[in-house]
């Protein structure tokens, strides 16, 4: 329980800013978040697209055109998956660069959090001991009440409720008092930790990771290299889709011509 209290207390002090430092997984980079959002969007479009295609192909116009959109959508999905697979090494390269450049900062923040955790440990131990003691006291007080519940008749329900209500209210008020006491004890360390985090963020804005000009040049170089490597992959992706796009266009033109003739 002590370990859980320590972790919850530090997260309470720092908010979500410090969450990744207490997890075994590596922190999610901006690139990770962008990739996840794109994947979710593509999956949503794919799912909704299949429903729309199924409705269209089952219609009279869809049957007449016989565009085989579902097959083409699967081909498009396969091509997109291959493009994503081909991009993976370059994405990994940029992500590793970001993690390397922020390693020193993350180490400093982890050290600050460890120091705060040690400072607040006595308060958490005290809170845990009081909480456990209170629960044990009320467990003992409720033991005879529980026995009465076994023999409870309908006529005694209100009487039993009258006995339980003040016990529950007292327990609630005393536990709230312990929580409030813990909050007051942790307040100075919360301010200290927030100040340190703000200071580190200010250092990033002023100095960069490492120096701003150096880091910017490195990022631009990486992006330029990435763009050069990605160009042939995107071109290949376009070439694979061209036949299906042309086929779709020709079928639509043919259908419109036939429709115009029938109207005329």
UniProtKB/Swiss-Prot annotation:
Pfam families, per the entry: Apolipoprotein (PF01442)
Gene Ontology cellular-component terms listed: chylomicron; endocytic vesicle; extracellular space; extracellular vesicle; high-density lipoprotein particle; low-density lipoprotein particle; spherical high-density lipoprotein particle; very-low-density lipoprotein particle
Tissues expressed in: Major protein of plasma HDL, also found in chylomicrons.
Signal peptide location: 1-18
Extent of the Sequence repeats: 67-88, 89-110, 111-121, 122-143, 144-165, 166-187, 188-209, 210-231, 232-242, 243-264
Gene3D superfamilies recorded: 1.20.5.20, 6.10.140.380, Apolipoprotein (1.20.120.20)
Protein name: Apolipoprotein A-I
Organism: Gallus gallus (Chicken)
Gene, per the UniProt record: APOA1
